[in-house]
Design a protein with these regions (language model features):
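Anionic-ligand binding region
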Residues: 144-146, 150
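Short, conserved charged micro-motifs
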Residues: 44-47, 233-238
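Active-site metal-binding loops of divalent metal-dependent hydrolases
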Residues: 166
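A cross-family acyltransferase "interaction/gating" segment
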Residues: 120-121, 159, 170-236
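Catalytic core of membrane glycerolipid acyltransferases/transacylases, capturing the structured
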Residues: 34-38, 42, 50, 80-139
Length: 255
């Protein structure tokens, strides 16, 4: 009874502490590091990606400190992914920042509105994050220029991760896919790695402000499978890649 009575207050306090991390850690620790990277790094884009990775690794370490009943399990094979287009199911706001925390060299798709936010937008642009137009409209004028750049980036060992559902699932089921990620993989002759994310929505549900701090949760990220360049992804329509990716995600959810 005591726990149920005070749980909303505890959820609010921990939520505010987690959001406070964004402000305090950025202002006092990471903004000076980003500024130094902008001025002195030989490869500014890669330096910003690395700083973003560290920023969110610290965030999840802080989350586990405040919420000791939350465990995070990452399959060893996930850390080894390089030079790939990564797709994953999408359950929570935590999903993209969790993937950022796993890969020092990464790019992803960010809503256009975030690029307009002062300072935050500068960080996103400097890290080389992409506009949704690249995956939503295959006829954008500079598509081939961006594809050429992406091909070189992937060849250097970087990863591009995308949530092909385009929005968080409210039911937990895998939603309809957009074809953009699969088109990029085809044009770049890049393999697709399919990741299964589980239980992030139990910690930070869609459409909620408060973190759910009162239940034991094991968040996991596992490699559901791969679609190689010569496995239907690089030949013909991206539809084959979409179908196989869905099969891998839906199949892994039954285990």
């Amino acid at each position: 009874m005591f726990t149920k009575t005070f749980r909303p207050a505890v959820d609010l306090i921990i939520t505010l502490l987690l959001w406070a991390y964004y402000f305090a850690a950025f202002v006092f620790f990471f903004f000076p590091a980003y500024s130094a990277a902008a001025l002195f790094a030989a490869d500014r884009e890669r330096a910003f990606q690395n700083l973003n990775c560290i920023f969110y690794r610290c965030f999840f370490a802080y989350l586990k400190l405040l919420m000791p009943r939350v465990k995070i399990s990452i399959s060893p094979g996930v850390y080894a992914i390089r030079s790939s287009v990564i797709i994953a199911n999408h359950l929570s706001f935590l999903d993209p920042i969790l993937l950022i925390s796993l890969f020092r060299q990464h790019k992803t798709i960010v809503k256009s509105v975030f690029f307009k936010v002062p300072i935050f937008g500068w960080v996103l642009k400097s890290a080389g994050y992409l506009s949704p137009s690249l995956v939503q409209d295959s006829d954008v004028p500079d598509l081939m220029v961006q594809v050429k750049s992406m091909r070189a980036y992937l060849a250097s060992g970087g990863n591009l991760f995308i949530f092909p559902e385009g929005t968080r699932s409210r039911s937990g089921a895998v939603g309809p896919f957009e074809k953009g990620a699969f088109t990029i993989a085809k044009l770049c002759s890049a393999p697709i790695r399919v990741l299964r994310i589980e239980n992030t929505h139990l910690v930070y549900p869609p459409d909620c402000f408060l973190f759910n701090t009162g239940v034991p949760v094991k968040i996991s990220v596992s490699l559901a499978g791969s679609i190689e360049c010569d496995d239907g992804n690089n030949q013909g329509s991206p539809l084959k890649g979409m179908q196989k990716a869905r099969s891998l995600l839906e199949g892994s959810s039954t285990h």
